């Protein structure tokens, strides 16, 4: 992250104020203030993660993934013959915190701040799937979007989606 000295000074002052306003996280803000003031390039890359950006397309894809899981759960609930479908496989696990942190952050924002999908269970890991999920979800999404009745899926369609 490239910043002018003026930008670094402004951000440093912001962290100093946050130290006073949020004593519970004061140590974190002091650390960030030091990094900014001294211009530690390696550590300043952390700010790229904090101030990262998700494109509109990625946000819409994540919402579609969450909507697909909602449709899977609704469809499963409405099935009379659930065959050998395991309900746990329909659960939205989230994304990997280590490699997909921005996606995970958006999911948490959608659920906890925006109030969308309140029925999704965050589990003990707060939607941290602890394994990469982006590619799997996109394969599932392609199958789901090809289904003619996306909210009235048959057991076969559900199986095809979760096995994608």
Curated annotation (Swiss-Prot):
SUPFAM superfamilies: YfbU-like (SSF116960). It comes from the Bacteria. Pfam families: YfbU. InterPro entries: UPF0304_YfbU, YfbU_alpha-helical_sf, YfbU_helix-hairpin_sf. NCBIfam families: PRK05445.1. Belongs to the UPF0304 family. This is UPF0304 protein PC1_2778. It comes from Pectobacterium carotovorum subsp. carotovorum (strain PC1).
